[in-house]
Amino acid sequence: MGNAILTSCQYQNYRRIDLIVIHCSATRATQRYTVDDCRRDHRARGFADIGYHYYITRDGVVHAGRALYQVGAHATGYNEHSIGVCYEGGLDIRGRPCDTRTPEQKETLQKLLERLKEDYPEAKVVGHRDLPGVKKDCPCYKV
């Protein structure tokens, strides 16, 4: 599917969307963590599928996660009215929080957010850490 998502009309959604929540996978800059790895780990935690609606790998490819009509599993207490977007990375080589987004990820994320804002103009874009009650560094950069 790849970046065709950015130009296709797959955004029909009947859920009210108030937030677009940006996440990182909390993996080291040197660690490969594919969308399939994320999906496997989320299912192992008891989720029905990957918790995010979109996942952006280091090469800048955006992968579809949960369908937008489905409630995500990415931000406890905020899932019902939000869309979850995750990028691969978020930790430096020592495992400390760090903005490890590649230029390709930054470009893809910007395009995806522009597209989502066209469909959900009232939605606020926030980092996971910006949500009240969240004690994480995710997405490891200022949104």
Task: Give, region by region, the residue ranges found by the protein language model.
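Basic/polar, cationic surfaces and motifs that engage anionic cell-wall
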Residues: M1-V21, S25, R58-V62, A67-L68, ...
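Short, charge-rich binding segments
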Residues: A75-G77
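Structured segments of extracytoplasmic/periplasmic soluble domains
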Residues: D37-R45, L112-D119
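N-terminal carbohydrate-binding/catalytic regions of secreted carbohydrate-active enzymes
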Residues: A29-D41, R66
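Glycine-rich phosphate/pyrophosphate-binding beta-alpha loops
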Residues: V71-A73
